[in-house]
Structures are given as C-alpha cells and as structure tokens.
Amino acid sequence: GEDMAKIVVMGAGIGGISQVYELRKALGKEHEVVLVGDSDHFEFTPSNPWVAVGWRKAEQIKVDLPELMSKYGIEFNGNGVRRLHADDNRLELNDDASLTYDYLVIATGPKLAFNEVNGLGPDGYTQSVCKTGHAATANLDFNKLVADPGPVIVGAAPMASCFGPAYEYLFILDTELKKRKIRDKIEMHFVTPEPYIGHLGLDGVGDTKSMLESEMRDRHVHWTTNAKITKVEDGKMHFTEVDDSGADKKQHELEFKHSMILPAFKGVDAVMDIEGLTNPRGFILIDDFQRNPKYQNIFAVGVCVAIPPVNATPIATGAPKTGYMIESMVTATTHNLANLLQGKEPDERGSWNAVCLADFGDTGVAFVALPQIPPRNTNWASRGKWVHLAKVAYEKYFLHKVRAAKTEPYYEKTIMKLIGVERLKESR
C-alpha cells in the first residue's frame, strides 16, 4: 500500500552493513530494506594492513552476504551499481537491471584514484591496503621482500585524506621485519603530502606530531613531508618536495623493493557529475542531517560524503572519516529516515568527531579530535599496547556484528569508554 517504502542502501562496507541492520531494526516490517553491494561478500577494511604482512588471511576478514541478508529480512543484490539516476529514483546495475527506490542511502566508500599518479597502485608498481584483495596481493609482494630484502617506501599520494593506515602499515611492517630478524637489512622511508609527521589530515591531534616522529626515530625510519609523488616506475619512485608556499623545492628519486602508497580518494563512477548531488571530486553533498539538499530522499554516510579539509596545506590533503564518525552518521541517518516515514522532519546530527585507533603491531596510537574541525574542545592522543588490543577487539566485534545482525554502536559503547579510562589514568 501507500504506507510501504522501499529503502535501498548502496554499498556493503562498514557503513552500508551497519545501515541496513539499523534500518531493519528501526523500521516496521511493512518497509522494504535492500542492500546493493559490488560483490557477494563484506570485507573488514581496517584489518587489511594485517593481511598484507600475513597476520590474517583474507578469508578471516570476509563474510558472505546473500544467505545472511535473507536470514535477517534484507533483500541483497551483489551486482553493483553502474549509474545512479537520481531524477528517476533508480539505480542502473552492472548487469543492466534496474532497481527503483523511495529512499536511497549512499554508503559506497571511495573510488581509489590510483590513476592520478602514473604507475601507482596494484596495476602499477605499488601495493595498497584499501581493499582486502589488494592486501592479499601486497602479502605476496611482502614475501618477496622477506626472501630478498631491499628498501621499502610507505606513504600517501597527493590529495590523500586517510593517513592512519599508512602509519599503521609502516610500523606493522617494521614490527614483522624485526620478528623475522631482517629489519637491519632494510632501509625504510615514509613519503607523505602532510606538512608534518602526524598531521593526519587533521592538522595534528594532541601530541601526534612528536609522538609519531619519536616512533619513527625509534624505528629508524627516514621521512619526507610536503612530498608530492609524481611518478612510479618498477622499483623507483619520483617525488617532489615543496616548500611551505607549495613551490617546488627539491626533486627526489628513491629506489624500492616493496612499496605501499595510499591513493587519493574520489567519489565512485556511479555518482560522478550528478549536479547538486556531488562535489567536483564526486563526494556526496549533505546537510547537517546526512541528507542531500537537492535530492531530499537521498542520504549518505561514510567515506563517500563531502567534508571540508581541516586546514589548507601546501600540497592538498583531505580530512579522514573514521569509524566513529561513520557509526554516528549511520545512527543519525536511521533516525532521520524513520522521522521522514512518519511525516516528521529530520532532526538528528551525526557527530563529526575523529576518533582513530592506529595499530602498530606491538603498540599503537589512539587519537580523539572533538569536533574534527577546530576549534576543538578535546584534542588528545595516547600511545600504548592497549590500542593494539582494542583494534583486535574491534575486528572480532564487528565480524560478529555482521554475522549476528547486531546493531549496538561499538565506538560509542566500548572504544569511548576505553579512551575515557586511559585519559583518566593520564590525568591522575
């Protein structure tokens, strides 16, 4: 009847899975909830650095979706979206089928813009931990490094916005190479567009600058900041170091045996260049309530939303979207969609708080920037073994959540408590 709405969630990552479970729980049975992914499985992206060094097998962080979704009353389609036709409330799928919706939640994550640097990425000469398949390939390359040690370059491309995993991978790699007693045979270099170590796209958080610099010194890692990677060849990286005004200062060429570089992100092709829906890089424009101002039946959550950079940097960088932000965007979207279905206006805002756990294998760094965009009332970072343990717990919890259709927000409940406890310890 007229009271039934069809809600489609586009993207089956951390945001999309959480979104369908919350919607299914919050909305009456008369409403239809559909999940569209671009494959038949979910992968837990935060664990990809562990896959790259062999601490996890890809299968351990993947979950098959079709049976699960039908078990929980959610329709599933794994064919992926070729194009969104927002004016017709319709998704054109990769198999030419069409899927119509009353409401759409876009949770696609990013398109990985490897093509912006010649030779970058899994089809070029560097590794990636952005997808689990990439991380599995990186593991093969890592094994070659172990068999025949040589220089390593880790870092991020210009316009990158997600730096945490680059630091994670650098330090996890260092930890694993020490375990294998070959760290002394390997020069490690970190190449980043950040204006300083620990900027993280957030203009630093608490003491991340000195904390991460000292971590690098302790681990004998060289670094170049304000670095713009221009080209990658087989075993050789070209990058330009700029000064604070952004003018070229020095050209560098570095040889490598193994390299993992995080690419810049863009919006996925399916939404590119839809006027009023996306910004020029394809990220979804949203209001305070996660809703697109032009297409009022479209919401967006996660890495695909447009948020402004925290500050201008000599080489353009973006601000990260962390697990805590994604979780709070999902919760706000569920509430606001439910309001619309009841004829009310959206009124819940997601919290733009950067809370990140960066695991270094033996230790780690947690940081909290509340709100993410300064001026901040909380700006705190801490280093310790507890971060590694918290990250392992988050992985276990989330994979369980996916399999059991749980909806409790983990950061809200567990991580924030843990951080509260750590902050209390430090203030005593």
Name each model feature, range by range:
Residues 367-428:
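C-terminal auxiliary extensions adjacent to catalytic cores
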Residues 349-366:
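Flavin (FAD/FMN) cofactor-binding core of flavoprotein oxidoreductases
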Residues 324-351:
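Internal hydrophobic alpha-helix adjacent to the cofactor/substrate pocket in enzyme cavities
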Residues 113, 121-148, 255-328:
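FAD-site-proximal beta/loop scaffold in flavoenzymes
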Residues 5-75, 158-202, 419, 427-428:
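Beta1-alpha1 glycine-rich phosphate/pyrophosphate-binding loop at the start
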Residues 30-34, 75-88, 99, 174-285, ...:
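A Rossmann-like FAD-binding core segment of flavoenzymes
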Residues 3-4, 73-168, 172-181, 249, ...:
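FAD-binding core/adjacent interface of flavoenzyme oxidoreductases
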